[in-house]
A protein has these predicted regions:
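Membrane-embedded alpha-helical bundles of multi-pass transporters/translocases
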Residues: 1-417
Length: 417
């Protein structure tokens, strides 16, 4: 709904910025609610509060994120420059994320006498909620405000902007019958499942398998170096190789790195937990991991922008909002599947004991072994699925150039008429 509405919106703020402004404040409020439930709630009321907060957060995020993603697709029609724009956006995101994580682990989740691993201290989360809510709203407003000068240069609907559910479904089905879009989206779906499945275990692994504290985890911010290098490599390599081939190579390397990481512990080839050297071994591994993760993060959105040109030749409309919205909705849905699978694994395969989050609760070695197998072996091997799908994706750089030439000729002809 938001994607189709955004594609057909014709306001003084263009097609995207009005919704970006509208989503900023609710997003910060819902973020605060999620991490700061009232203390007087009963268990059943707490479940209701969390449900309301999560659903509200998802809705507010959709209102902001869908036009924001579409806006990024619109900024350039150049095949290579699209990757550069996405790359710079990711660099800004990584810098902000690293600064945020370092600040939180240093000043909010610092160790205390009762909680040597500060991220397990429940008293830290109200302050975290306030800071996060304010920052999210502020950055959303800034993002919209500082890019408003681009509005006059963006495409607008050339026909009356009739909007209905029928219009939405027509655009939806038009995209689903695009074979290139279908393959790309399905590969992203499975990658989202794998990423959320593996991400579910990251905090658990860092806390219980590797024994890291909040002070240790803040040094993982060094991974920003890997993000910068990965984005640079993605942009440079896309000039010489097909984007899908670069993603396949990056995902394959990522799979190997994850397996090697836990294998080093199995063979006792890394320092023991608590040794300061272990932190830096893991930081180096994280830098390598972020290099290969940031490459698909750069190239997937760039490929979606390329597909918006292909889709225009089929439907006659610019559908960046719908393209991004379908992907965003599916990513939310599939990431939830990954979290559910992770929870089931944690309960029925790993056997994590109840109350493990409380400091001092012992965890048996076989539980930690199954945890490592789930995170390092099972989750990483699932990357074979998106790799296999992307191997069948055949749209090339030359194909995109030809499509863009056709669109330029069509727009020039229509303008003369």
């Amino acid at each position: 709904l938001v994607g189709t509405f955004s594609d057909r919106l014709n306001s003084r703020f263009g097609r995207r910025h009005l919704l970006m402004y509208a989503g900023a404040l609710p997003l910060g409020i819902m973020m605060f609610c999620l991490f700061s439930p009232p203390a007087f709630l009963s268990d059943s009321q707490l479940v209701g509060w969390l449900f309301f907060s999560v659903v509200g957060l998802r809705l507010a995020f959709t209102v902001f994120q869908v036009p924001w993603v579409a806006f990024g697709m619109e900024l350039s029609s150049d095949y290579e420059e699209r990757s550069e724009i996405i790359g710079w956006r990711l660099v800004a995101g990584w810098i902000g994320g690293v600064a945020f994580s370092f600040g939180m682990y240093t000043f909010v989740f610092g160790a205390s006498e009762g909680f040597p691993q500060g991220q397990l201290n429940p008293n830290s989360y109200p302050g975290f909620a306030v800071i996060t809510g304010l920052l999210v709203t502020s950055w959303c407003f800034l993002t919209a405000h500082l890019t408003r000068h681009e509005i006059p240069y963006l495409l607008r609907p050339t026909e009356p902007t009739n909007y209905s559910l029928l219009t939405m479904f027509k655009q939806f089905w038009s995209l689903l019958f695009n074979p290139f879009y279908r393959k790309l989206v399905i590969s992203m779906f499975f990658l989202a499942i794998v990423s959320s499945f593996g991400g579910f275990f990251d905090a658990i692994m860092n806390t219980f398998f590797w024994g890291l504290t909040g002070e240790d985890l803040r040094w993982f911010g060094v991974a920003i170096l890997g993000a910068a290098l990965g984005i640079f490599l993605a942009v440079r390599l896309s000039r010489y190789y097909q984007k899908q081939h670069i993603i396949i190579a990056a995902l394959s390397i990522n799979m190997v790195l994850a397996i090697v990481k836990v294998s080093l512990r199995f063979f006792d080839w890394v320092p023991e937990n608590g040794d300061p050297m272990l932190v830096w071994v893991l930081v180096i591994q994280e830098v390598l991991h972020v290099i290969v993760v940031s490459m698909p993060m750069t190239l997937f959105p760039s490929m979606l922008a390329d597909l918006s040109d292909h889709q225009e030749t089929r439907s006659g409309e610019r559908q960046e909002g719908t393209i991004g919205a379908i992907v965003g909705f599916a990513m939310k849905l599939t990431s939830s599947v990954g979290l559910i699978l992770g929870g089931l694994m944690l309960d029925h395969f790993i056997g994590m004991p109840a109350g493990a989050a409380n400091a001092g609760v012992p965890i048996e070695s076989d539980v930690l072994f199954r945890l490592a197998i789930s995170d390092g072996i099972i989750a990483s091997c699932l990357l074979v699925i998106p790799i296999s799908i992307l191997a069948t994706y055949k749209m090339s750089h030359a194909d995109i150039k030809e499509i863009q030439n056709q669109l330029r000729y069509k727009r020039h002809t229509n303008h003369e008429l």
